[in-house]
Amino acid sequence: MERKIIHIDMDAFYASVEQRDNPELRGIPLAVGHAEERGVVAAASYEARKFGVRSAMSSQRAKRLCPQLTFVSGRMDVYKAVSRQIHEIFHEYTDIIEPLSLDEAFLDVTENKQNIPLAVDIAKAIKQKIREELHLIASAGVSYNKFLAKIASDYRKPDGLCTIHPSQAEEFIKHLPIESFWGIGPVTAQRMHSLGIHNGEQLRACSQEMLTRQFGKAGVLYYEFSRGIDLRPVEAVRIRKSVGCEHTLEKDISRQSSVIIELYHVATELIERLQRTGFKGNTLTLKIKFHDFNQKTRSITQSHELTTLAEILPLAKGLLKDIEYTTHPIRLIGLSISNPYEKNEE
């Protein structure tokens, strides 16, 4: 039986919740985050995005792009509560739900509680319920696998609804920029470009052997995605083992002050991801990749969960002291939290 998969992605979720709850913020460029010198944008409204403001951008750069930008502090408890309300709507149609974060999820509606034959009708109903009951906007992608459903949900944002039928998949993928493929970030995209691969059609022309040689196990996925193949199931119980982020630097750095500043930005983004996913762990890992692509990792485990910048940044600095980089310029800095933490309850 051909699967019916929906990907739901809330549009500018944090910012939209703030605009919903505060009429004075509606219609203006809005950023959720901190405006101070070293602050980072956690989310940007569509009014702000018109000026080029994006999440994970430094607040200073965001204000240069949009001087009239308004900042508000995030309310993670509210976002989590709204996310639970969204999932209650999902559960009216299926219990096979794989959350990716507070604001997006996959749904397998092949067999659904309402016995609705068309997945696109379920997607329409979910979007309408979210709009009417929660006064928020969602985009939805519908297809026969996770890869295409996620691509479809991004296609007509905001408030989008896109369906990719099996008969349309090859043509759709052919024109897809390589950066839009799942698992291809800026560094991998740059490598793809160096190999003459810029879109789905060019990726499809590559053999599995060549892609595996260049990209390891990920090459198999790229080979299959370019052919519209994705056999991964929607995992109703998705156990996350870690949360992390990495920054590949525009220029290699070796000056201590520059490294510390970049470490701060990575740590700040890590905190935002921890809050968004709700993940809790007590092991911090620092990853440093040097200009020659050699890399080192250092880890430290605490007796309690690591959730704040005040805890994580000093630990990261301590791990950094164990790595010699003044004579080996750094090209990438990464931080991750792992070892899921469960508090024992008496």
Predicted regions and their residues:
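Gly/Gly-Pro- and Ser/Thr-rich, intrinsically disordered tail segments characteristic of DNA damage-repair
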Residues: 1-214, 220, 337, 341-345
